[in-house]
Amino acid sequence: ALPIPINSNKSKKKEFIIFNHSPDQRIILIKTKKNQTSTDNEKNGASFYNFVKSNLLTNFTFFESNISETQIKNKSFIEEFVHGMQLKSYEFNKYKSKKEMTDMNVNIVFNKKIPVKIKNNRFSSLLEGTNFTKDLVSEPGNILHPDEYAKRILQLKKIGLKIKVYNEKDLKKLGMGALLGVGQGSVRGSYLVTMEWNGNKSKNKPLAFVGKGVCFDTGGYSLKPARFMEDMTYDMAGSAAVVGLMKTLALRKAKINAVGVVGLVENMVSGNAQRPGDIVKSYSGKTIEVLNTDAEGRLVLADALTFTEKKFKPKFIIDLATLTGAIIVSLGSEYGGLFSNDDKLSEQLLEAGEKVDEKLWRMPLHKNFDKLMNSKNADMQNINYVGGAGSTTAAQFLQRFIIALVVALGHALGPRVAAIATAERLPQVVL
């Protein structure tokens, strides 16, 4: 018989109970459901991490022989459980003079053999890519400006990614007036960075991922309110997700061809900053009247999307961006908004989101919205001043910069990244 439990988690569910086994050993019972998904296992692991951390426990051994028959059928149970612990253990404390020690030693005994440390498993590369994304998003704007960001991406060459950085001189030569216009008020440079992973030697079209990388967004002369402006370091989260994805693919030696493209800028106020009413010429040749300098992300993505399509001729393009506050009004922080011109791609993205509990909701695209973005002075304007459909008109704007209609395009517009702090486990992909 087990001794009387000395502690349990405060939750009514009582997922964990600790028993004293000996002066230096304790047994922890973990409650699980009958038919747990991989995400359920990760959530259990995340909750377990919080539990053992609060009880100051740092060394664990999982015994495969003690796993219930229900869970032993899932051969990945322990790996998924520990992955949830690892995701939840993330902490950005780089700039704290006193750091809380959170290291935990986790072992596993398979078939009563010697304990094996869980270090390199099938989730290791995913964890590295995820944490790299989180590190990028967490850096303050004075540290991770476009110049520094481009340098950090270049470091990924050592894991096999083919990387090219286009600086302002290159972008001017290419004619990327939309992207350059956003960054012209900053003393920092503006860049377009491409990352290629060729894991499949066939000549299959690559999968393309494009990310918005506004390292800090003041709103420009369409200035944002002072309150919460510090959160605008998160306006590069879409690009960070793309960079983390490309790192994961390279570490996994994934058998696919993929390309990641990110536009890196700072949207600042200065004597050289873009003015409301300016007209810029995009890489596509289409002109844009900039009525609002705080609708800048779509200008960065416009050039990045056209460039990605023309240069890489991908099977599809998915862009990730913290593009509009309007999507939060529509969906809150539980769902990311999905806009797509391809039903099959949409179904795949929605299904993937459900599986990892990072849910997407498909929003409408329709040619009737185009008239809201038409300009009297240019081919289009960058904002809808009529009111309403803010996220849809932003996506409709971006769709104009896909030249060939055969390219499937998906836009994932995410809520404020700060919302991830309340998640049961920290998300693996930040939108």
Regions found by a protein language model. Name each.
Residues P415, E424-R425:
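Compositionally biased, low-complexity intrinsically disordered regions
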Residues A1-G213:
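Short amphipathic alpha-helical segment within the helicase RecA-like ATPase core
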Residues T133, A150-A412, A419, L431:
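A generic structural signal for tightly packed, nonpolar segments enriched in small/aliphatic residues
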